[in-house]
Amino acid sequence: SYGAFMVANLLSHSNLFSAGIARSGAYNRTLTPFGFQSEQRSYWEAPSVYYNMSPFMHADKMKTPLLLIHGEADNNSGTYPMQSKRYFNALKGLGAVTRLVILPNESHGYRAKESILHLLWEQDQWLDKYVKNK
C-alpha cells in the first residue's frame, strides 16, 4: 500500500518511468484525517501536508501509464477500495492512460490462486504494452 502511494507520487512528479503498477494504495490522504505513516497531526492541524502528500490532488500531472489493482474487500482503514476507484476516475477524467483491476473477495493482501494468477497476468500485459522494447 505504501509502495502504491510512492509509485503514484513518483509518476505524478517525474518522467523517469515508462509505466507504473500500484496495488492497494492510499491516494487521497484527506480520507485518513487522523494521521498516516509518521504524520501524527490531524488533517485539520496540517491540511497542506495532507493535500501535498496526496497523489489524488496531483492527478492532473500524471503523464505515465498507471495500472491500479485493489482487493474488493480491502478492510485496511487507510486503503479502502474507494481510494483506487476515486483515483482511477480522476485520472481517467483527466485523460491519463490508466486501468483499474478490482480483485473479487480479496482484502489488502491477495490470497486466492485465481486472484494471484490474474494479478500476474494483468501486470505482465501492462509491462509488455508500456515498457517492453521501449
Predicted segment positions?
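Active-site-proximal cap/loop segments of hydrolase catalytic domains
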Residues: S1-K134
